Each structure stands twice: as structure tokens, then as C-alpha cells.
Amino acid sequence: LMQKYSPEDVQQAFVHWQRMATTAIEDFGGQVDKIVAGSVVAFWKGDDEKKLAQKAAHAALQIREVTEDFSEHGEWKHHQEAHWECTLVLSSGFGLTGSVGGEGGQGSFTILGDPVTTAFQLEKLVSKLGEQLIVAGPTAQLLKDSFVITKVIKVKLKNAPDGMDTYTIAS
């Protein structure tokens, strides 16, 4: 978008969209970790992995909905020429949180672990798979009783060399 539209227009739209995405995440008990190259990285903490996955899925569906509204109803001022889109990835499991870099805990707060690695690898594939929302196999297993889950494809990942099934969630 930055190549076709003014940086100011894109930045203004992204900041507005980011606020909407953050609100959706927080509405379902999540926390935003960081924003990397247009990606919002969020996490949910707790002991009930199934319940946490459900909250994350609800947030993802809400983000998908507000993004459609944002694009379709003119909040993105170039909506007639270019649809504002986002891709969403859900990956769950145990990770670490804490400060990285800097001395004495003065670094940046972040999350680390297999679920994060999986999410970043899947994020690179979402558009190629023709989907807007991809759910990692282990997360889909946590969601299958609460959502309509459809298998997309099995993909090889660095941390899943034998492959991992991917799914999407129906609206």
C-alpha cells in the first residue's frame, strides 16, 4: 500500500486499524506483545489452554469483522481502489515472557517459544494458502468443539519438519 498511497494515509489507517485490533484482543482478555511489520502479536495467559484458545479465536473473528467494516465503509479512504486486509494466525502452547536484550532486565518485553515460531512461519503462508485466518493444528484441536473448523493443508515448518495440519474457522 505504501507504494501506491501516501505514507500519511497508510499510517493513519494503520494506526486506526491497530487500535481496533488491540481493542478486540483486550475485549477477549489478551495482551498485545508487539507490532512487527504490520503484524500485531498478542498472547493470552492462564492455565486453561482450551479456554485461552477460544478467547483468541473470538478475538481473531472480531478482528476479521472490524477489518471488513473498516475497509468496506470508508474508514480506509482508498477503499474503492484497494481493500484493506489483514491476515490472522492462531497458534497456542506454552511460551516464555520476559525482557530480552539490555542489562539488568532493561530490554524489551516479549514472548518466546514454539507457538510464536509456529505463528510467524504460518503468517508467511496465509496469503499463499488463500485464507485470511489460519489455525495451527494443535490449536484447532482445542477449538473443534466450539467452532466450525475446516482443514486447509498440511505444511512443513522448521519446528514441525514432518508437517502440521492447518485449519481455518468459519465465520
Question: Predicted regions span which residues?
Answer:
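Conserved long alpha-helical elements within nucleotide-processing catalytic cores of c-di-GMP signaling
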Residues: L1-T22, E26, D33-K34
